[in-house]
């Protein structure tokens, strides 16, 4: 008797029999009889689906081509007009002038050919706008978010950009370059939300997030290209001020604080050295006038116009980072060019995270459908534009993030072309003409799972009532001390210590008047005076020393370290004798000491008991009192 396997081997031998055998083997999969048996227990039965690629005799699916054209331009206000949302429809016959980020005019290409290929993305099954908004709002409140049921995740296979095709990558880059377009003409902007017509307000075009909507011929695929950071260096030109605020919110460890001197501070969440309030950071990021909030509203309005279309996202620089955050939120294919590393803000926005993934390291997440193109000479893309003398720092940008979500597609322009790292290579026009068009092939995309942002920083959470928590107080179960310091110092309090108590002390009062001060004390003879106090004390001992001959010494020129530099003066008393009196005046003193004048003397007879006195005086003394420059008149 033949076994089933032997029967199958004998039947499926010829070529015609192989086709018939394959159809027979696929019948259990496509036939409803196997699944609809009528029993309740069979309803939850899961049978693995065999992909057509796994069958060797079926052809592989080739990338499909799409031809995209500009259909709409959306503008969402962020700072001056946070409720502003306008739409400009572009007709095929509309003439559009495109200006690049550096002001150069470009010839507008009405059509862009892009190919697609299947892409696997892990995302939520329920991605309705109202459901996602509720989850994002609850994620900012841990108490509410913890009570929600776990969302249902799935890995969907949907058409995405063919990142291995050079033409596709090049045209997507051109779409992001065209996203820097100014107002294309005199067409009328329509209000998307709200009854307020703010089009008459001057300057609204320079405030907000601008996205360009491209659609293929069948409207089956939509591409949203978001505008990135303006090229102006300082404030006041285009949307540079707003872009700088968002850049420092998104890509710095703590709002541009605790780093370089020129970084623009955009919030007050810094607590101490390398310590930051993460609750304050999240609150600053999700405010309604920020770009991420504007991108969510823009996506909601685009999907309202095209509810059944597949949406792709593209962007350059800040626009690329915002596109990536939006793609992580809704599970959309994303292609960015020279995008700022966005894993850091992705970990702070409360984005939905699949089970088994660390929310603090979104760069380790798989099946994101995000691809970030860039080259090694761009310090913004590589995450190195944060030194003290870097262009970003001098312009006020705090670019501390270095990790990308999804996969990185890096052109090694430093190694292959010998480029030097510089901010000038960040512009999208340079990337298009000097990088993408110059290379024959596109680089291989790889994930960046081992990267870490802000490794030296510590982040803590607060209740959200204060941007910076008050000073903490430390209590001990064995000792409690309360003190108020009015003069804090570097290593403690500088206030004087006050002690309350009853003590009995012996009071000793010393009064001294120094007539001859020296460098390290007084040179006067020591005089001691003792005043007895009321407290009993030992009997004082007073010692008096009587000199046989009193001597009085007066020093006019004290020395540096003690002693006297005056010339010696001698007084001698001799009874029953008389001697002449001699007076000497030096008019030519020596260089160091002595006198070069001839010796002169005057004799004056005196009475008995007289003495010989010699007086030498000097008005100006130099070299520590050893020489005389100006003799004093006598």
UniProtKB/Swiss-Prot annotation:
It is an enzyme of class 3 (hydrolase). GO terms for molecular function: phospholipase activity; triacylglycerol lipase activity. Residues 526-552 are annotated as: Disordered. It is a single-pass type II membrane protein. It is found in: Endosome, Multivesicular body membrane; Prevacuolar compartment membrane. GO terms for cellular component: multivesicular body membrane; vacuolar lumen. The chain crosses the membrane at residues 16-36. Glycans are attached at residues 162, 197, 219, 277, 301, 308, 463, 576. Its EC number is 3.1.1.3. Keywords: Autophagy, Endosome, Glycoprotein, Hydrolase, Lipid degradation, Lipid metabolism, Membrane, Signal-anchor, Transmembrane, Transmembrane helix. It comes from the Eukaryota. GO terms for biological process: multivesicular body membrane disassembly; neutral lipid catabolic process; phosphatidylserine catabolic process; piecemeal microautophagy of the nucleus. The active site is at 317 (charge relay system). Its main location: membrane. It catalyses: a triacylglycerol + H2O = a diacylglycerol + a fatty acid + H(+). Residues 1-15 are cytoplasmic. Residues 37-634 are lumenal. InterPro entries: AB_hydrolase_fold (IPR029058), ATG15_Lipase (IPR050805). PANTHER family: LIPASE ATG15-RELATED (PTHR47175:SF2). Belongs to the AB hydrolase superfamily. Lipase family. Binds to both phosphatidylinositol (PI) and phosphatidylinositol 3,5-bisphosphate (PIP2). Lipase which is essential for lysis of subvacuolar cytoplasm to vacuole targeted bodies and intravacuolar autophagic bodies. Involved in the lysis of intravacuolar multivesicular body (MVB) vesicles. The intravacuolar membrane disintegration by ATG15 is critical to life span extension. This is Putative lipase ATG15. It comes from Coccidioides immitis (strain RS).
